[in-house]
Structures are given as structure tokens and as C-alpha cells.
Amino acid sequence: MARQAPSYIGSTAPQQAKYASALFSKFCSDIKAMEGTAPLLDLGPSTTRNVMYWLREAHPVSAFDIMVHEMADQVSLDYEDCAFGGVLGWTVLSHLGPRQARQLMREIGRVLRPRGCLFAIFDGDGRRNLGAQRYQIIDAKNLEFEPIEGRRAPRPVLTREVETLFQPFRETRIMVMRHGSREVLGKQP
């Protein structure tokens, strides 16, 4: 009999399901500090809750579930150059092959404004594979996650590969979370 992983979204979660995220908090403060409205691109798998969070903060959001296109040879974002002040990459890079991940990073760099920010989460730390996870915003300092049933497990992405993917960014910060995922914050030059 198959075991189903429990869902912790919206319930009293064990400590590992809800956690404080210093890099997400920094992403939020950087977005709020931008002049004018900073449109955001939310690369899924996202949730209505995440989109609603940004709309309440008065930031227009375009949501695009790149995972629907994960088998495509070409990864492209159908948006104008410099269209977004910030991009959220919810585990998408750890589900793409290395070549597709590099293509997506070039596309993200193209659609981000100068001094724009990318917040990305990688499932697992390159050694441990957590399986596919869905992350949701609680507030500007906290996130929570749950397993995604039926989604193939992400490939292991080593820290060296993460550093290479984020090389074009002016500033990059990487944190390994206690539950095993990695968060990355990159800022455009």
C-alpha cells in the first residue's frame, strides 16, 4: 500500500513545514524598495495564495508554470526585455535539465530589469533529494512547503551548478535550509 505524504499547508505544521526565510525576506524588502511598481514573474508551480500575496502588496504578477513545458527542447519566456522587477523561481530550476536550466536563466536575465531580483528554491541540497515540493508564502518573512504528489522527483543540483547558473548576477546569496532545500537570491547588475 502506498503511503501518502501528509499535507501541512494551512494546518498546524511540524517545524520543518513552516520556516523563516531570510533570503525571501530580503527579496521582499528589495522589491518594496524599487521605484514605482515592480511587476513580478512567478515561475511555478505556484499557487493562488502566492499570487494573492503579491496583489495585496500592490505588485502586478504574471504567473507562468514552466513545469508544463519542462519536456520542451527550448525554454523561452514570452515577455518583453526588462519587464519585471523580480522573478520567483519555485523549484523550477531543479526540475529542468542542465541545458534547459541555463536557457531559463538567460531568459530570466533578459526579462529582469537592471537591479532586479531573482529568488529561487532548489529541492534538495545536491546530496539529499526531498522529492517535489510546493512552497507558499505566509508573509514577508515566512514560507511553508508540502510534497507535490505525482510530480517526478527533481534531479540533484550541486552547489557548484547553482553558482554557475547565477554567475551573471551582480550579487548572489545561497542558503541551505534545515529541511534540506536551498534558497538563492540573485540581483541583476
Question: Where are the predicted features?
Answer:
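Class I (Rossmann-like) S-adenosyl-L-methionine-dependent methyltransferase catalytic domain
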Residues: 1-40, 46-76, 117-189
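Short, conserved clusters of charged catalytic residues that mark active-site
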Residues: 45, 91, 103, 157
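Residues at alpha-helix caps and immediate loop-helix transition turns in enzyme cores, especially N-
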Residues: 50, 100-101
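A short acidic, Gly/Pro-enriched loop at the edge of an enzyme's catalytic core
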Residues: 72-87
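A short SAM/SAH-binding and catalytic strip from SAM-dependent methyltransferases
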Residues: 83-100
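A structural signal for the main folded, soluble domain(s) of proteins
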Residues: 92, 115-118
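A short glycine-rich, Lys/Arg-flanked "PGG" loop and its adjoining helix->strand segment in the class I
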Residues: 102-114
